[in-house]
C-alpha cells in the first residue's frame, strides 16, 4: 500500500522533485483531506493528507512520477447558511494544478447539494489534475522589456488568430505552437506590434447553459485551473505538453522582440452560483475563497455567479503564487486583469488593498506590465483612473469618445483633445504616466472595427439569449445601410471612417491596443458579444484579409515610432514643444472653439509632425503653420504640395504631414 511521508507546505500544488511528488493544499476550515490518485483505468487510491502546517495540508509521495493523475476529497461540515459546503463525495481539482485532463460535463452529479450534501460520487465525471515535470531549457531567453512609450499591444485569441492561416501547418493551427511559428512572427514584425495580449490561456470550462445550447465558452473567461495552460490550445503532438508548447511560443516571440501579456481571471471561478458545480474552491474552503452574503449565498459583483475574495492572506498568496509561476516558469511579460476592480475589494474598492500592495512590492513582478480592466458590476465597481502605482488601465472613455467624434459627431474638440493626450483628466495624478491610458477603439468584447462602421445595432441572435446580451451602447454607424453589403459610396465612407479611427488610435498619446483582425477588415457579422462563437464568426479569415488596410495600419505604427512626443511617455505641457493645438486657420483655438467649434483641428507634435483632422461632413481648406510640409505615408493626396500653405482636407479624414528640416 502506498503511503505518504509528511512532505512540506510550500509550494502549493503538486511538485515533482525528481524522486517523488510533494502535494500541498490550503484549507482553513476542513477537518480532513484525502489525496486521490488515479491510474490509467481511472482506478482510485485514497491517501490521507495527514500533515497540517497552519492551514496547509501536505504530504510527499516517494517514487511518484510525472503523469500521475490526482484530485482531492475534502472533509468538513456541510452548513450552507454558514458558507460551509464540504462534501467528500465530490472529487476536487487542485487550485494550483499545472495540468488538467478532461472536460467538465453538464451533469447533476457534479453539484455538491443544496440543503444537504449530495451523495453521488463525482470522480468518474470530473477532470483530473496531472503532475508534470516543470523542467525546461530556456537557453538564453530574456524579456524584451519594451518601454511603455514604445509599446503597441495586439489583443488576440490563440485559436481564432491562427486556425485559418493557410501558411501554417494544419496540425499547428489554433495552437500555442502557431503563435511562435515563423509565419506569424514575420507577420507581427511587419505589422510593428510589440506585445501580444492573449485572451485567457488557462484551462477553462463551458457553462452548463452553453453546453445545453450546443455552444462553448470560446473566449475562455470561465477559468477552471489558473496555473494550467489550456489543452484546447495544444497541437496534441505526442512529444509535446501544453506547458512546453506555450513556453516554446514565448521563447520564439521573445527572440523576435515581442512581449507576451496574459489576460487572467481572478474575479470569479467556473463554479458559478449556488446552482453551479462543485469543482474545486467551493469544496476546499468556500468562505476562504469567495465573498459570501449573510445567508451563505454568493456575492455576484462579476455577473458570473460568484466573486473571489482576495483581501485575506491566503487569497493573496494564491494569486501571487500563480502570477509568479507564469512569470518565473513561463517568462510572460505582463498581465491584463479581467474585471480588475475585484482585486481591490475589501469589500469596497481600495487602491491600497492587500493584493495590490503585494503585486507592487514583488521583485519578480516589478518588471511586468500590469493592466487592469478597471471595473466590475458591483457597488462602486467603476474605477477608471483609480488603480495604484504602475498599473495601466483600459480606457473606455477613449473608446467611446473617439467613436462619438468620428461616427456620431457629438463631442467637442476639447473632449477629443483630452482623449488624444492620454486622458490626463483621468490619469495625470499620483505620479502616473501617460502609458496608464490603454487606448482602444475595439476589443474582444464588442464590435470589431469593420462592424463598428457597418452596423448601427448589435446582432447577437446566435448566442441563444434572444439578442439581449451584449452592449447597446456602441456609438457605431452603418453609414446608411445595416450590414456588410452596401453600394460603393457607402463602402468608401466606411473605409474612410476605419482609416480615421485607426490613425487616431495609433497617433494618440498613451498605449495603443489593436484588436487582432481590425487591420484585416474582419467582421463578426454584427455580433458584439461573440464569447460563445467558436466558428467563422470569430476566426480570422486570412484568405480574405484586406491587405491594403493591413499595410495602412503597419505604416501608422511605423510613423508612431518616429514621433518623439509619442515615445517619451511624459505628460504634454504648454510650450514644451511636444504639442501645439491649432484651428483650421492655423491659429490657437479660442475657448469657444474648443467647446463649440467645428470638428476641425491641427495638432503639431514634436514641432515637426502635423496631424490634420476633419471630422465634418464636408472638405475644408486649412491654413498650415509656417514651414515646408510634406505628406507622409500612409497618407496620399495627389499634387498636395502644389497648393501649400493652403491645404484641402477631405471630409471625415485625417492625415499627417512632416516639416522638412
UniProtKB/Swiss-Prot annotation:
Coiled coil: none annotated. Removes maltotriose and maltotetraose chains that are attached by 1,6-alpha-linkage to the limit dextrin main chain, generating a debranched limit dextrin. PANTHER family: GLYCOGEN DEBRANCHING ENZYME. It catalyses: Hydrolysis of (1->6)-alpha-D-glucosidic linkages to branches with degrees of polymerization of three or four glucose residues in limit dextrin. GO terms for biological process: glycogen catabolic process. Keywords: Carbohydrate metabolism, Glycogen metabolism, Glycosidase, Hydrolase. Residues 460-481 are annotated as: Disordered. Pfam families: Alpha-amylase, CBM_48, GlgX_C. This is Glycogen debranching enzyme. The keyword Hydrolase applies. Transmembrane segments: none annotated. Pathway: Glycan degradation; glycogen degradation. HAMAP family: GlgX. One of its GO terms (molecular function) is hydrolase activity, hydrolyzing O-glycosyl compounds. It comes from Serratia proteamaculans (strain 568). The active site is at 338 (nucleophile), 373 (proton donor). Its EC number is 3.2.1.196. Belongs to the glycosyl hydrolase 13 family. The record marks 445 as: Transition state stabilizer.
